Amino acid sequence: MRESLGVSLPSRPLLLKLGLLSLPWALCAGLHAVGLGVWLVLALGWFASLAMLVLLLRAPRQAVANANPQADAASPAWSAAQRALADETAQLDGHARQIDELLHSAIRQLSDSFHGLAERIDTQRGLSHSLIERYDGRGQVDEGINFQDFVRTTQQTLSLFVEATLETSRTSQQLVERMDQVRLKITEILQSTQDMDAIAKQTNLLALNAAIEAARAGESGRGFAVVADEVRALSTRSTEFSAAIRKHVDVVHHEIQDAESAISQLADKDMSFALDSKHKIQGMLDDLEAMNRHTLKVIHELDRLSLEVGQGVDAAVTALQFQDMGSQLLGQMRKHHARLGAFALGLGALEARPRQEWPERVAREVEELRRPLPSPVSQNSVNVGEVELF
């Protein structure tokens, strides 16, 4: 059939080998589809392909030993296999470098973002601590006074004001009592002026009687009549003077009554106003104290949340170190790629060697390929294990 069509198709063993080599990559594609990381999928695919290639290349020694003259006459295309392997390893190495660059760029941006977030959280915690020190009164404040000192100073000032007002009210009460005593004294003075009026009237009456008697005496009573006139004049002046005193004392008496009433009202008003103001201000200070306690509670809660967020950021920054492990694993993959490339070069060089040397050289290349390389990462999680630092 192949001769009739004029087309040279691959042999069945070659198709079987190609199918076996593509099987690991198909499995890795399925793992990537379910969410496995691309760099881990590439590593698994490469190691699986390498193992499959080693298994397929175990046969050359036995095949050469049992080959018939017709098989020896056919020369394998080692250079073509070498070029195919070299192209494949170059593509794998390019993908590994691309993954490394993408990881490095993304992790650097994430790390910078987390470090900036950590700095802002530290600033927020510092502000919270300054508010706590200012509101709870336990810390030293560089400028001004804290809230507790403000409340305490306000209470002391208001207490002094209330005490001064109460003392003024008490003094006003004492002044009212003194004014009452003065009012009583003025009442007595008014009573005395009335007595003086009565005396003046009696004196005037006596002077009038004396003048009458002097007129009856005639010439001998003339001198006595003069004295009687003077006594009457003195009595009149005493009456006028007593009236003037009574008038002034009445004015003073009314003024003192008005002053006593005003002082009494002021004392009562100051007392009630001071007590009422004291109660209201004490209620306001109690409300401020309750508000202060609530504010402190909220600030403490914010400080606790900031601490937890900071710890989460630190844990995230620590977890970002997986980029170092990924880079080292990708570097390890490039080493294996280089060994695979050297193995391909060795296969390509077999064309220039006698066929009798092929089994030995292939076995030597396979042995070199099987030689293990030290792994820089000995863990499968970022939480445990060690990483070889660059």
Swiss-Prot record:
Keywords in alphabetical order: Cell inner membrane, Cell membrane, Chemotaxis, Membrane, Methylation, Transducer, Transmembrane, Transmembrane helix
Q: Where is the Methyl-accepting transducer domain?
A: 173-265
UniProt main location, coarse: membrane
Query: Is Phosphoprotein among the key words of this record?
Result: no
Example GO biological process term? Answer: signal transduction
Task: Extract one GO cellular component term from the record.
Answer: plasma membrane
Q: Where are the transmembrane segments?
A: 36-56
What is a GO molecular function of this protein?
transmembrane signaling receptor activity
Q: Identify the SMART domains for this entry.
A: MA
Record keyword Transmembrane present:
yes
Disulfide bridge partners, by residue number: none
Q: Name one Pfam family in it.
A: MCPsignal
Membrane topology note:
Single-pass membrane protein
Family annotation (InterPro entries): Chemotax_Me-accpt_rcpt, MCPsignal_dom
Without the gene, what phenotype results? Mutants have general chemotaxis defects in media that are low in magnesium.
Compartments, record wording: Cell inner membrane
Stated role: Involved in chemotaxis. Required for an optimal chemotactic response.
Family as reported in the entry's similarity comment = Belongs to the methyl-accepting chemotaxis (MCP) protein family.
Provide the protein name. Methyl-accepting chemotaxis protein McpA
From which source organism is this entry?
Pseudomonas aeruginosa (strain ATCC 15692 / DSM 22644 / CIP 104116 / JCM 14847 / LMG 12228 / 1C / PRS 101 / PAO1)
Q: What gene makes this protein?
A: mcpA
